[in-house]
């Protein structure tokens, strides 16, 4: 075994610093004594038991560490494991798994050669960045969701307000329609009452006029005994009209007939538009006979008929 392969030849496998030298850094000449070790100042957070792997016989620590600063660990590994076969150096099989640092193994003192303080390890930026990115993405997604939900709520609120306005307009239109219908119904009822009252008034007026006509006819019948020719002719026409209505097939009454003859020929069941049949007195025949027999009456039958028609028209015009 060479000097390079000492007790501390496995330390390069535990070293993770690429600037650190290989097994050549820990030689027998580079061992330091106990007083040199005590010269280093230790921080309170550094474990003291990490220095137990270093032998007290190592010396010239600082000089050897200055030489190993620019050493390449790959070159040291190649020189260490190289064998000469057939005049040519042939490297033996090398397992890279040996270079991996065990989980429970501590770093040696060689790592702290250039600095008295322990190395400060950077936090895992990749993991933190992934976590921060995931948090940022989650925050962005949640923000977008909140915005989308807020927009949906605003749209729903707007739709609700539009529907409420539409329903309010419908209610107002329905109330106006009902109010107009009530007013129209009241107007029709008022008009019906007015027309009904007017109809009643007209009917009462008709009855009043009928009663007046009957009173006038009765008054005329009272004056039938006065001997006035106009009244007699008017009564004769009334009797003729009533007879024609009651008996249309009977011949018309001659106007030359006397009232006594008309009364005798008229049946008692005929109605003259009064409450009862007209009763003519029997005393009317004597004055008429006396007048006809008088010397002053020289009118013939035809002239009497003509004169009576003219006098009746004059009475109507009056």
From Swiss-Prot:
Keyword Ribonucleoprotein: no
Gene3D superfamilies per UniProt: 1.20.5.170
Annotated source species: Aspergillus flavus (strain ATCC 200026 / FGSC A1120 / IAM 13836 / NRRL 3357 / JCM 12722 / SRRC 167)
Region of interest (Leucine-zipper), residue spans: 202-216
Family, per entry: Belongs to the bZIP family. ATF subfamily.
S-S pairs: none
Induction comment: Expression is positively regulated by the developmental and secondary metabolism regulator veA. Expression is highly increased following piperine exposure.
Region (Disordered) location: 114-157, 275-301
Chief place where the protein resides: nucleus
Compartments in which it is found: Nucleus
Keywords, ordered alphabetically: DNA-binding, Nucleus, Stress response, Transcription, Transcription regulation
Molecular functions per Gene Ontology: DNA binding; DNA-binding transcription factor activity
Location of region: Basic motif: 160-199
Descriptive protein name: Basic leucine zipper (bZIP) transcription factor atfB
Organism lineage: Eukaryota, Fungi, Dikarya, Ascomycota, Pezizomycotina
Annotated InterPro entries: bZIP, bZIP_sf, bZIP_transcription_factors
Pfam families for the chain: bZIP_1
Gene responsible for this protein: atfB
A cellular component term, taken from the record's GO annotations: nucleus
